[in-house]
């Protein structure tokens, strides 16, 4: 009896250690990664945005299949006091800009800014005149040889379909044969000047539509417009990626920085 009492007393004084909380380890691990993923997603959507070039309108500066990271903090938000607190910069002529398409804001476009508020723009035989001065544009690519009176001599009477915004531009913002860019708006064109659906057809880019500017090509892959325009990855595109990833990746363009130019 005395031995049993001693054993009970010993158990009370030295209770057995509880088993390790195995469930706490995965819970903590999951919690840490959840926070990390949230931060990554927040940073990706707030600071930078991924974008892929689906068409050839910016050739040869940007090619179909170039995957970009877009700096969303590059430009000061219009009408926000925060533009005085952070090192933003204004949208400049020659900048490559990413923006919501004015005709359908669900679509994202990338073009070169050719005119800022107050600028006067016209094209004569494909040559751009900015505020009365002909521009030297080494970045421009002319892919087709057939003439188009509206495309090449702008503004003029359209011989092709233009959108309501483009018609409004022609009706209300042409002075002495030149388009005058209104306040809080920008005139954008593709570097592939002969094959670009741009401000000549759908008018100005509102300041509020501008998302940012490209920073870097993080991957460049030789894919078709059909594959890249599809919101879901087709089986054929997936097979093509698996079979030709190394041969169709443009390694010289991958991790290439994207720069604007000085247009004056």
Residue ranges, per PLM feature:
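Soluble "head" domains of membrane/secretory-pathway proteins
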Residues: 1-27, 46-52, 57-264
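Hydrophobic membrane-insertion alpha-helices, especially the h-region
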Residues: 32-47
């Amino acid at each position: 009896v005395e031995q049993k009492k001693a054993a009970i007393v010993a158990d009370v004084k030295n209770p057995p250690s509880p088993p390790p909380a195995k469930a706490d380890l995965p819970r903590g691990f999951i919690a840490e990664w959840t926070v990390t993923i949230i931060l990554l997603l927040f940073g990706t959507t707030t600071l930078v945005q991924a974008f892929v070039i689906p068409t050839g309108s910016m050739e040869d500066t940007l090619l179909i299949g170039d995957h970009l990271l877009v700096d969303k903090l590059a430009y000061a938000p219009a009408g926000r006091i925060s533009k005085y607190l952070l090192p933003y910069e204004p949208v400049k002529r020659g900048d490559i800009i990413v923006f919501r398409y004015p005709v359908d804001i669900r679509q994202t476009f990338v073009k070169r800014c050719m005119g800022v508020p107050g600028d006067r723009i016209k094209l004569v035989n494909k040559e751009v005149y900015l505020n009365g001065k002909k521009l030297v544009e080494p970045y421009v690519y002319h892919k087709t040889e057939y003439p188009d009176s509206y495309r090449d001599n702008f503004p003029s009477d359209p011989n092709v379909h233009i959108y309501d915004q483009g018609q409004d531009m022609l009706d209300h913002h042409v002075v002495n044969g030149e388009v005058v860019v209104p306040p809080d708006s920008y005139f954008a064109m593709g570097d592939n000047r002969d094959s670009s659906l741009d401000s000549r057809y759908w008018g100005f880019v509102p300041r509020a539509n501008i998302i940012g500017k490209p920073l870097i090509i993080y991957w460049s892959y030789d894919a078709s417009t059909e594959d890249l325009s599809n919101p879901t990855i087709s089986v054929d595109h997936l097979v093509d990626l698996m079979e030709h990833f190394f041969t169709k990746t443009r390694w010289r363009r991958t991790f290439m920085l994207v720069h604007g130019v000085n247009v004056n």
